[in-house]
Structures are given as C-alpha cells and as structure tokens.
C-alpha cells in the first residue's frame, strides 16, 4: 500500500486540521509543470490578440475612438470563438467569448445609433447652418429644440404679427424663416427684420424682468412670411433643463439685439450689411431693446423726441456716440490753462472747509 494514500496524517492535512505537518510529508511532483512547451497555437488565435492590442492602443483623441475600440474588441472576440470551436474544442472559452461578443455588439450598436445622421427639415436647415451649427449645437439637440412646443406659422403681406400696446409679449418667441417684416413706432418706420433673425428678441429679454407687458412697436409682414414660433413658457422650462442650449440662446438673442440697434441707427441697413455685423458684439447686447425703442419718444405727451430721432437717423450711415469725457460734472468748474493746483478745479463743499498745505 502506498504510504501517501493510507497515512492518517495525509488525510488530516487534506481536510485542513493540521496544516503545520505538511512540511514533513513528502509531496509528489506536479504533473502539470510545463516541462515540454506545446506547439504554437493557430494563426487565428494570434490575429484575435492583435485585434485586442490594436483596440487598446487607439488614442482617445481620435474622434471615433470608442467606435473603433468596440469594433476591434468585437472582431477579436469573434476570432476567439472561431479558434476555440474549430481548433481548440474548448467549450468554456467559446461561451465566455460569446458573452463578451454580445456585450460589445450592444455597445457598438448604441454608439453607431448616436452617430447616425440626424435629418433636419429642409425649411429649418438654413436656420441651423446660419445660427446653431457655428456654435456647435448637435443636430439631435437642435431637432429636440424644434420638434417640441413649436410650430411654423405663416403671415401674408400686410398682416400684423404684433400690434402696439395691444399684443402681449409673454406668449411666444419667433425666428423669421422666410420673407421680411418691418417694425414701426406710432406709424414711423424703425427697422426691418430679415430671415434667420429673431422677431421679438428685445421683448423676450425685457419680459425676463417684467411680466404682463405689451408690445411697444408694431410688427407687420412686408412680404409673405414664414416663421418658427415657440411657446414662451414651455421654451423657458426646456432651456432650464439644457444649460448649454440656454447659453446659446442668451448669446443669439444678445447678438440679435445688437443688430437691431445698428438697424435703428441706420435704417438703410439691408440684409447683406446686417450679416457683416453679426460678429460685432458690444455692450449694447446688455441693453433692453424695449427701452431703446421707448427712448426714441422721450415723452408720452409729444412726439418731439421721435421726430428728432428720425431726423438724426435719416442721413446717418454710422454710429455716433458722444464721449463720456465731454460731460462736465455739476460740481466741477472749467479747467483753465495754467491751473496747476487741484484745489482750484473743484468747488469747496462748504466755506468752513479746512485746507492742509504740504510744507516744502
């Protein structure tokens, strides 16, 4: 009888009661020791590992990095299954790689679905290329924006979009898609609105601070017009859930207000000139256009301010802004030549003011 098979010490060691006695028990040689290396595996096995290696070294800066990675892993798992089935006859290797293959195929399908070309309506494609694509708004996000709580409406020539002191500014926000509109105040022309421009961006900015206001201008279709119209309330809720798109709208509305300010100062500004001004952003974007439109009438009792504004802008081809340095303070006297003492510039606040002179 073999000693290692009948010894009670061997049985207790196998059970785990006396592991400290293992050092004195002779251990048979390991039959699985790689004394003779087997032959190299089939070429399919090596190609599968090459696919794994290529997928792992793809740089993350590549645009389609994840798609290429999942594609190489899918190919590698497929080759592993072929090798395990035809050349190795290993059921466990085939099963595990089948699971990995399924996971990679699902993830690859999802990535391809996300990268699918999003079809934008032909009528909205011009607006997307002009306004949103330069700001890197994804097509799927633009489609969500234009596919919910908005509609395309039509106005015939001469029809009114907004009436002065009658139409509420809290209902909608619109972008002109086709045609031309003109804006007037008390029957006097102010400026035009061209395609891919907001119709009521000044009112949208003003209603963020004050609710329940009315249009202070009249907007009439000067041609057959089509425009995209959002519900103001639902658009606000949607932008709150999309911070990126919220900032995009702030920028676009600010730029549109700037263009309208240029148009107010130059009524001859046409669509081609307006396009050249799109890149010129200034502090005017922070001014409420509603206040700008109202400022042309300094008093509700007379139209002197309006006529003065119209006379000043009829022949104006560029902006003329008075320098703030030309405004004299009420507490300052004119500085005469040769005045060297700063105390002579300002009037004394009171006759009892004590002057302190520095000793030489």
Swiss-Prot record:
The segment annotated Required for interaction with KCNK2 runs over 136-186
Biased amino acid composition, Polar residues:
350-360
What Gene3D superfamilies does UniProt report for this protein, alphabetically? Jelly Rolls
Q: Name one Pfam family in it.
A: POPDC1-3
Keyword check for Coiled coil: no
Topological domain ranges for the Cytoplasmic compartment = 70, 114-360
Q: Which GO terms describe its molecular function?
A: cAMP binding; structural molecule activity
Give the compositionally biased regions (Acidic residues): 337-346
Biological role stated in the UniProt entry: Cell adhesion molecule involved in the establishment and/or maintenance of cell integrity. Involved in the formation and regulation of the tight junction (TJ) paracellular permeability barrier in epithelial cells. Plays a role in VAMP3-mediated vesicular transport and recycling of different receptor molecules through its interaction with VAMP3. Plays a role in the regulation of cell shape and movement by modulating the Rho-family GTPase activity through its interaction with ARHGEF25/GEFT. Induces primordial adhesive contact and aggregation of epithelial cells in a Ca(2+)-independent manner.
The UniProt family comment states: Belongs to the popeye family.
Illness association: Muscular dystrophy, limb-girdle, autosomal recessive 25: An autosomal recessive muscular disorder characterized by slowly progressive onset of proximal lower limb weakness in adulthood, syncopal episodes, and markedly increased serum creatine kinase, which can increase further after strenuous exercise.
The protein's assembly and partners: Homodimer. Homodimerization requires the C-terminus cytoplasmic region. Interacts (via the C-terminus cytoplasmic tail) with TJP1. Interacts (via the C-terminus cytoplasmic tail) with ARHGEF25/GEFT (via the DH domain). Interacts (via the C-terminus cytoplasmic tail) with VAMP3. Interacts with KCNK2; the interaction enhances KCNK2 surface expression and is inhibited by cAMP. Interacts with CAV3.
Descriptive protein name: Popeye domain-containing protein 1
Query: Which gene codes for it?
Result: POPDC1
């Amino acid at each position: 009888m073999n000693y290692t098979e009948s010894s009670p010490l061997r049985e207790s060691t196998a059970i785990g009661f006396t592991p400290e006695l293992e050092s004195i028990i002779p251990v048979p040689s390991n039959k699985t020791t790689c004394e003779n290396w087997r032959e190299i595996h089939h070429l399919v096995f090596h190609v599968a590992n090459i696919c794994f290696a290529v997928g792992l070294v793809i740089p993350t800066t590549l645009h389609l990095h994840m798609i290429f990675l999942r594609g190489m892993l899918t190919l590698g798992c497929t080759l592993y299954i072929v090798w395990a089935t035809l050349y190795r006859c290993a059921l466990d290797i085939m099963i595990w790689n089948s699971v990995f293959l399924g996971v990679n195929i699902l993830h690859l399908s999802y990535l391809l679905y996300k990268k699918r070309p999003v079809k934008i309506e032909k009528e909205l494609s011009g607006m997307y290329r002009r306004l949103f694509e330069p700001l890197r708004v994804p097509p799927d996000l633009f489609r969500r924006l234009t596919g919910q709580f908005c509609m395309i409406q039509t106005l015939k020539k001469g029809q009114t979009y907004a009436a002065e002191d009658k139409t509420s500014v809290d209902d909608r926000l619109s972008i002109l898609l086709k045609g031309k509109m003109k804006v007037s105040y008390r029957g006097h022309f102010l400026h035009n609105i061209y395609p891919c421009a907001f119709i009521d961006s000044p009112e949208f900015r003003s209603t963020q601070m004050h609710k329940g206001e009315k249009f202070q201008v009249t907007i009439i279709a000067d041609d057959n017009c089509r425009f995209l119209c959002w519900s103001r309330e639902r658009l606000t809720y949607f932008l709150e859930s999309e911070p990126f798109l919220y900032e995009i709208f702030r920028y676009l509305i600010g730029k549109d207000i700037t263009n309208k300010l240029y148009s107010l100062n130059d009524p001859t500004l046409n669509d081609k000139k307006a396009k050249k001004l799109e890149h010129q952003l200034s502090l005017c974007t922070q001014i409420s256009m509603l206040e700008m439109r109202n400022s042309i009438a300094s008093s509700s009792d007379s139209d002197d301010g309006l006529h003065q504004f119209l006379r000043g802008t009829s022949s104006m081809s560029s902006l003329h802004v008075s320098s703030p340095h030309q405004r004299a303070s009420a507490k300052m006297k004119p500085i005469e030549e040769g005045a060297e003492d700063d105390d002579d510039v300002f009037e004394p606040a009171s006759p009892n003011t004590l002057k302190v002179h520095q000793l030489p």
